[in-house]
Amino acid sequence: MSDLSDIRREYTQGGLRRANLPVNPMDLFEQWMQQAKDAQLSDPTAMCVATVDEDGQPFQRIVLLKKFDDNGFVFFTNLESRKAKQIATNSKISLLFPWHPLERQVAVLGEAEPLSMLDVAKYFMSRPKDSQIAAWVSKQSSKISARQALEGKFAEMKAKFAQGEVPLPKFWGGYLVRPASIEFWQGGEHRLHDRFIYTKTDADWNIDRLAP
């Protein structure tokens, strides 16, 4: 077994104070997302999406956030994928944005609900054509014999859709994650990190500081 106990560093980039927090957590998320983009982080919209199967086994994967507003967080996926099947069984979901260079992370707990076909189609048509074709090619999470089979299918579908628009696959869609809570974590000196959690109420958000 490899001993990794000596890998550590101090967090020095600043703290997070209650007096500076906005009432709406999405305002703080927007600010942090913009700062992650301004810092030119690699894939600032990348988030770890956790779902649970019918046996209670959790699964995680990296997915790109495509939109957010006061309603929540939006991502798109193959509806035959493992994550989509798990969401159909249990809509509870967790998102994590790991912005390590900024010594920050944001954790979201909530429920996922399917997007309308209009919203899905609108986003699908905005994708590069090769990405649209790739959506037709991959039966996500299924076992394949070799990469060559995937590449061959891509070439076949690229020829099929060479002219005109690529239609929206029936098995492709998206989700809105409506947050029940959003936790903001900022690294602090001596491991005295700052953690604030926003919890949704019927009318507003409660804000609490958590011990690091």
From Swiss-Prot:
| Highest taxon, organism lineage | Bacteria
Q: What class of enzyme is it?
A: oxidoreductase
* Alphabetical list of PROSITE patterns matching this protein: PYRIDOX_OXIDASE
Q: Name one Pfam family in it.
A: PNP_phzG_C
Q: How is the cofactor bound?
A: Binds 1 FMN per subunit.
Binding positions for substrate per the UniProt entry: 8-11, 66, 123, 127, 131, 191-193
| Entry keywords, A to Z | Flavoprotein, FMN, Oxidoreductase, Pyridoxine biosynthesis
| A GO term, aspect molecular function | FMN binding
Q: Which cofactor does it need?
A: FMN
The record describes its quaternary structure and partners as:
Homodimer.
Q: Describe the family membership recorded for this protein in Swiss-Prot or TrEMBL.
A: Belongs to the pyridoxamine 5'-phosphate oxidase family.
Q: PANTHER family recorded for this chain?
A: PYRIDOXINE-5'-PHOSPHATE OXIDASE, PYRIDOXINE-5-PHOSPHATE OXIDASE
Name listed for the protein in its UniProt record: Pyridoxine/pyridoxamine 5'-phosphate oxidase
Query: What's the source species for this entry?
Result: Shewanella frigidimarina (strain NCIMB 400)
